[in-house]
Amino acid sequence: MKVKLLVLLCTFTATYADTICIGYHANNSTDTVDTVLEKNVTVTHSVNLLEDSHNGKLCLLKGIAPLQLGNCSVAGWILGNPECELLISKESWSYIVETPNPENGTCYPGYFADYEELREQLSSVSSFERFEIFPKESSWPNHTVTGVSASCSHNGKSSFYRNLLWLTGKNGLYPNLSKSYANNKEKEVLVLWGVHHPPNIGDQRALYHTENAYVSVVSSHYSRRFTPEIAKRPKVRNQEGRINYYWTLLEPGDTIIFEANGNLIAPRYAFALSRGFGSGIITSNAPMDECDAKCQTPQGAINSSLPFQNVHPVTIGECPKYVRSAKLRMVTGLRNIPSIQSRGLFGAIAGFIEGGWTGMVDGWYGYHHQNEQGSGYAADQKSTQNAINGITNKVNSVIEKMNTQFTAVGKEFNKLERRMENLNKKVDDGFLDIWTYNAELLVLLENERTLDFHDSNVKNLYEKVKSQLKNNAKEIGNGCFEFYHKCNNECMESVKNGTYDYPKYSEESKLNREKIDGVKLESMGVYQILAIYSTVASSLVLLVSLGAISFWMCSNGSLQCRICI
């Protein structure tokens, strides 16, 4: 009976001992992050750093409407193609939108010199002042200024560019001309002109009354002399002749001088440019909408404060940096490994092995206790708040450092610059690869550090409890301690807040340790007696059985027994 009581006492003591466990928060989150060492780690909380959505629309940029060129190209707009007349009144914009294949460009066929460079210059312009550099009615009294072409027709009638004048002879003469303009606008002025190349000498004589014409354009930074190239050419837009188009930027205070004795397509209007950060030219078929955004891409507007995006590499406005990543998620919480609910006396005793507690909702790290007054969860607010502050500051710092928002417009190359374009693409691809690698590596490293940081915090909390309890409790694994004394709610609270009174409970703990050790020793002695008794009994049964078998075999002659004296 004594043995049975001791065994029951031991079982009762182990089952109903007061217990406290250290663990961490868990929830039903399915967020996954990658670290340097692991992929798809499920975590309780994380933040997305990569924007992958857009609205599919063209929007105002900070309240300013874009300049939609519609069916016109940049060339058609800036030269004043008659079909682009509606664009003449537009003098300010947030960005410029050109469709992929606009119909109305240079209506009179010819070569547009340095067109890609002009587009690049205009991509940084947010407004201009269109003014008459050489008034039509007063600048050319000795020349005809009404030159038109069927290839530039408007409303079924022959017409010409609105920003240029086609000068021809007057009264059978084409006097030498010399005209200058001094830039007093205190801004760069864009000046455009053209040189006509007739298809035959007859047209040359009829229009300009000379066979040896020239055009000279000179400023402080530009000097060029043009000679018409008279030659038969294939018809383009029903024209065998050509007009080559040229432009220059005139600095404030500089003067440009035009001299010619024929073939000049003279400037009528010029443009005083106002540069603006965040402007640009994009090629897009996206529809315009009544929306406002800070970032515009050819695919649609992005409204995001995230540091990275994978929508499009060409952006206008304050935009996240483009990377080729499919996922950039930074952990802000802990590993999310909910404990097995059916295990342990508490239903979910977690810690360093089992997993986190879904019952603890007010913090990241904390305690679960069990005593005669019940059980419950409590977060350690100080360590949780310190961790939250540290991680929040880190995430904000990462976003701030990587969130260099800017405009990234595409570079323009003409058909003769394919090698340069291919080289540029390789360079851009290299930069994109570097940015993508840096972004991904940064997130991987920070995720690894954050998860290690949480593990360290839980272990520190465990060591804090262990150093208080000393030998007043024993470690039972999974981050739990079993008290050798009764620990009510007040006692539990003192352990949690670091004011546990070790001497107060040491005597009770010592007595209970000795009782438990005594129970173990007596139980061991009983088990030894039982083992000896069982061995002796088994041996006796074996000897009796062997004797009975021998006696039976001797009686029927199967076994002969001889006893010699």
From Swiss-Prot:
The protein's location, in the record's own words, is: Virion membrane; Host apical cell membrane
Transmembrane stretches in the record are 529-549
Q: Any S-S bridges, and between which cysteines? A: C21-C480, C59-C291, C72-C84, C107-C152, C295-C319, C487-C491
**InterPro entries on file:** Capsid_hemagglutn (IPR008980), Hemagglutn_HA1_a/b_dom_sf (IPR013828), Hemagglutn_influenz_A (IPR000149), Hemagglutn_influenz_A/B (IPR001364)
Query: Which terms under GO biological process does the entry name?
Result: clathrin-dependent endocytosis of virus by host cell; fusion of virus membrane with host endosome membrane; fusion of virus membrane with host plasma membrane; viral budding from plasma membrane; virion attachment to host cell
Protein's membrane topology: Single-pass type I membrane protein
Query: Coiled-coil regions in this chain?
Result: none
Spell out which residues lie on the membrane's Cytoplasmic side. Answer: 550-565
Q: Which GO terms describe its cellular component?
A: host cell plasma membrane; membrane; viral envelope; virion membrane
- One function term, GO molecular function aspect: host cell surface receptor binding
**Posttranslational modification:** Palmitoylated.
Q: Tell me, how does this one assemble?
A: Homotrimer of disulfide-linked HA1-HA2. Interacts with human CACNA1C.
- Quote the function comment for this protein: Binds to sialic acid-containing receptors on the cell surface, bringing about the attachment of the virus particle to the cell. This attachment induces virion internalization either through clathrin-dependent endocytosis or through clathrin- and caveolin-independent pathway. Plays a major role in the determination of host range restriction and virulence. Class I viral fusion protein. Responsible for penetration of the virus into the cell cytoplasm by mediating the fusion of the membrane of the endocytosed virus particle with the endosomal membrane.
Family affiliation: Belongs to the influenza viruses hemagglutinin family.
This chain's protein is named Hemagglutinin
Provide the species name.
Influenza A virus (strain A/New Zealand:South Canterbury/35/2000 H1N1)
Gene giving rise to this polypeptide: HA
